[in-house]
């Protein structure tokens, strides 16, 4: 086992090259990028094999961190949630604007993403601001968070003891590389590499609380000196079409502004410029505006599910916090399929009957009808 000290972190970064994205965007966002590549064609298979050879001994990289109350407080407020957990009596509980969560408060599903953020000196970051941890060699340095899964093995509501990440605990993150596979984007014929990474999060008692598997897509780097064609904005659905699209569904609508994206970037220490630098996002990477973080959409799907599932099950009485509904899924599998853009409304939705099912299909759908993220939330004990 390797402890990820400052020196070790630097070695990993220098063994890789700069990346260009840390969220789930898709091939359609830069479908014409093949004319703007910064490097000549390379052998994806050879680069994948060279990347895996760096981790062929199965080494792990370990970090430890205190889950402090202020970080999770600011993170929840940035997501416009005044409480970490849905409450049955808001009047009896102070909001996060008024007070930090007390020690021992469980961290909601996927909110662990505000901890264990990238830790690199500025000179090691890519030109686009992204960190270079666990990257393949050039030219495959443009990273996108394409999907993955999160499991909460210690959150079984029927267990005598639950192993959860909680505020005030010192937690250990264990990271390992699982895979690196060459792929081809069907629409463009462009080569890419798909890297699988696994992160374990263990509490102070060394109990596994979260198993977080992430799939990163690495595409060929773009040449910033060559202008990018913008992604056209599709026509939004009419109000009648929007109303019809949510019939029989539980849903919420969002339109993320630049301030929200900037705060989310700061709290996750994500310096990728597509989230806050509009000229970079539009002129270099070809987006039509700044891009909403993929993890923000993942959390939105989980927030919708846990709020509705908690109400349906009557969770709250006798839970760890007065009047708070503490309820976790068993797991979620998710995949980003298209970017979500700042100041463009979109909806997170799932079928109403899904709260009474073992598996709940969740979707992030732009108001022009584009499906931007898909997820399947698995409950603990309900029948299919």
Over which residues does each language-model region extend?
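HotDog/MaoC-like acyl-thioester-processing domains
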Residues: 6, 32-61, 147-256, 336-384
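Long, contiguous hydrophobic alpha-helical segments, chiefly transmembrane helices and signal peptides
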Residues: 67, 108-116, 143-146, 150, ...
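Hydrophobic, proline/glycine-rich low-complexity stretches
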Residues: 28, 32-172, 313, 317-324
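Catalytic-pocket segment enriched in acidic/His residues
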Residues: 281-354, 367
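N-terminal mitochondrial targeting presequence
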Residues: 1-46
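A broad, structural surface signal
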Residues: 18, 32, 73, 77, ...
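A contiguous, surface-exposed recognition patch within enzymatic or periplasmic domains that forms
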Residues: 40-102, 106, 231-300, 304-310
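Residue-level recognition of well-ordered secondary-structure positions
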Residues: 76, 114, 118-121, 176, ...
